Curated annotation (Swiss-Prot):
Annotated gene: pyrG
Role, per record: Catalyzes the ATP-dependent amination of UTP to CTP with either L-glutamine or ammonia as the source of nitrogen. Regulates intracellular CTP levels through interactions with the four ribonucleotide triphosphates.
Domain Glutamine amidotransferase type-1 as annotated: residue spans: 294-537
Protein name: CTP synthase
Highest classification ranks of the organism: Bacteria, Bacillati, Bacillota, Bacilli, Lactobacillales
PANTHER family named in the record: CTP SYNTHASE, CTP SYNTHASE-RELATED
Active-site residues annotated for this sequence: 383, 510, 512
SUPFAM superfamilies referenced in this protein's UniProt entry, alphabetically: Class I glutamine amidotransferase-like, P-loop containing nucleoside triphosphate hydrolases
UniProt cross-references to Pfam families, sorted A to Z: CTP_synth_N, GATase
Similarity remark: Belongs to the CTP synthase family.
Source organism of this protein record: Lactobacillus delbrueckii subsp. bulgaricus (strain ATCC 11842 / DSM 20081 / BCRC 10696 / JCM 1002 / NBRC 13953 / NCIMB 11778 / NCTC 12712 / WDCM 00102 / Lb 14)
EC number of this enzyme: 6.3.4.2
Amino acid sequence: MTKYIFVTGGVVSSLGKGITASSIGRLLKNRGLKVTMQKFDPYINIDPGTMNPYQHGEVFVTDDGTEADLDLGHYERLVDVRTSKYSNVTTGKIYQEVLQRERRGDYHGGTVQVIPHVTNMIKEKVMRAAQMTDTDVVISEIGGTVGDMESTPFMEAIRQMRREVGSENVMYVHVTFVPYLRAAKELKSKPTQQSVSMLRSIGIQPNMLVLRSEMPVPQEMKDKISTFTDVPVDYIVESLDAPSLFDVPLSYQEQGVDQKVVDFLHIDSPKPVADMDEWRRMDERAKNLKYKTKITLVGKYVELEDAYISVTDALHHAGYLYNSKIEVEKIQAEDITEDNVAELLKDTQGLIVPGGFGTRGLDGMITSIKYAREHDIPFLGICLGMQMASVEFARNVLHLEDANSAEAEPNCKNNIIDLMADQRDQEKIGGTLRLGLYPAMLKAGTKTRECYDGQEVIQERHRHRYEFNNKYREDFEKAGMTFSGISPDNHLVEIVEITDKKFFVAAQYHPEFLSRPNRPEGLFKGFIGAASGLQVDKF
């Protein structure tokens, strides 16, 4: 019987419910259990694909092409699982499917209501995640905060789950905040008590409390919280601010969280103890890096940390492999000009230009890429970064001064980057990009092939609408650009590189989405190796 863990949050947002869910998932996975991660987002958008990065942060992409919440990236990296369309559900998706069923007549003329139709659909999504992944445990994070109007149907649905699948198969984990008042020099438990009271008022009794705090929570306060919330004191866990994400699951294990979960849900795990030896080695490495490598990220959304979270995580993963701390300096692409590029990049050891949409900042990207190419600074381009690297090469090496991307200039004569053929008649924006996992054939003797340890074929995740214009392939190759990765049908350019440079590689896909702390993605591994000048130092 599949077990279900629902992670909710109270008091304030951004408490780290996703990290809590991921940490529990990692511990259970390391006990030999198959874990499926799931995120419910209360917003009415179908998915975050059309949302401004400043509104939502990064859009994560799964193997099957789902555009999803960035928390799925945390799940994949921390738990080391692959997510799918069953892993991210929004209010928009729920209502869309309910209304489609109503239009088909599936409700036989009945009045469609939040209860039972919307709540039944939410429960169906939870159950479907279990069925389609054949999993032992589904861990579902409920976005938002207890008491939010938008979260109400989700809370009602997970309340009903306990009755429908049995209380022995459902566990509610509530993450809450214990603030420290510096003036009074004490922690306050009242917000937690009120949050649990609100949760209980809608019929959910939490089985475990995770107390987020910047200070250790004294035992007498845990006893008090237990008294007011009816949560056994042994099931009250503290989660302190940590210097590294790797600390969180280790702290949970020390507090016996995984054992409490398997005991509560009556799970007979294949391993009696979670094997966290490799995780501890990663934690030690992350805290005691010997070297430093400075990387400059030139992008469109640099003011928001979450906009490039997978990219920066992937850089750090590669840094662990070389025992080097990666110091990422982010520069707004719009701020870069021919006059200041030398000053802005004078101390960098590597340049990365990640993905994005629209025309803002393109000139700054091109200027920075030109400087990196001419001064042999290791460069990695991703998606839009690859497209701008191609435009830069056309303008400054092939001397096609009007070269551009059709996204920036639709009527451009030398459109080096063109709209994909199957996108020309596309009227909708949402969910219509080239999305998901696609193969690429790697050319022998290239840096790209070396990055992937000699593999002939790789599978990587994509999110784009434009592609390299194949009519320029021959001219590019004659001028020194190598097409080191091509789709199996030889149509779509996946990777370009200048092989005689220290490292100048750009990919149409998003390599950051498949990076893991203990397995850095190939292009990031090659990029940081070239930028740092260090040898691999395995931990």
